[in-house]
Every structure is written in structure tokens, then in C-alpha cells.
A protein has these predicted regions:
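Ribonuclease/tRNase effector modules and their secretory precursors
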Residues: 1-92
């Protein structure tokens, strides 16, 4: 893990079955959306998915594909929480 996660985020990663490589990929390639309260939300919109398909080896892309609904919330450089999107986000 190349990121700093809060205790809450670490627990949510485990509870929600999200591997740490998904969060690494979100940090490196994910789209940043602001929540207008000081936090940033990282997601995998279609443009990012297309970029990943072209940049990652096929086996890594396939492993990541089932986690494209994941998001991470960052505040002051620390991951606050993670989860799976169940509703469409504006702009996606």
C-alpha cells in the first residue's frame, strides 16, 4: 500500500472486499471530484477505464475490472473511506 488510510478506511477496505491495488490505481489514475466540503472523491469513469485498458497488462486490467464501481474519499491526503458506488455520480 502506497497510501495513508485512516483506521475507518482500513476497516472499510476489509469489510467491502476492496483490494489495496484498487486504491493504488484510483490514486494514480482516478478522476477527482470535489464534494465541496474539502474532500476529494476518486472514481473510475469511462475515460479512465479506457486509459487503463490501453496502459495496463491484460491480466491486471481484468482483475481490476470487477472493481470499477469503487470510490475513495480523500481529505488532506489521507483516505477517509472507500466503498462501492450504487448510484450514478454527476458527470459520469
Amino acid at each position: 500500500m502506497d497510501f495513508i488510510a485512516s483506521h475507518h478506511a482500513t476497516a472499510r477496505l476489509q469489510q467491502r472486499g476492496i483490494p489495496s491495488y484498487v486504491i493504488d490505481t484510483l490514486i494514480n489514475y482516478g478522476k477527482v471530484n470535489h464534494d465541496h466540503h474539502g474532500a476529494k472523491i476518486l472514481t473510475f469513469p469511462k475515460a479512465v477505464r479506457k486509459k487503463l485498458r490501453n496502459r495496463l497488462p491484460k491480466n491486471k486490467y481484468i482483475a481490476l475490472e470487477s472493481h470499477f464501481d469503487c470510490y475513495a474519499v480523500l481529505s488532506e491526503g489521507v483516505i477517509v473511506t472507500v466503498g462501492h458506488r450504487t448510484k450514478r455520480m454527476k458527470g459520469h
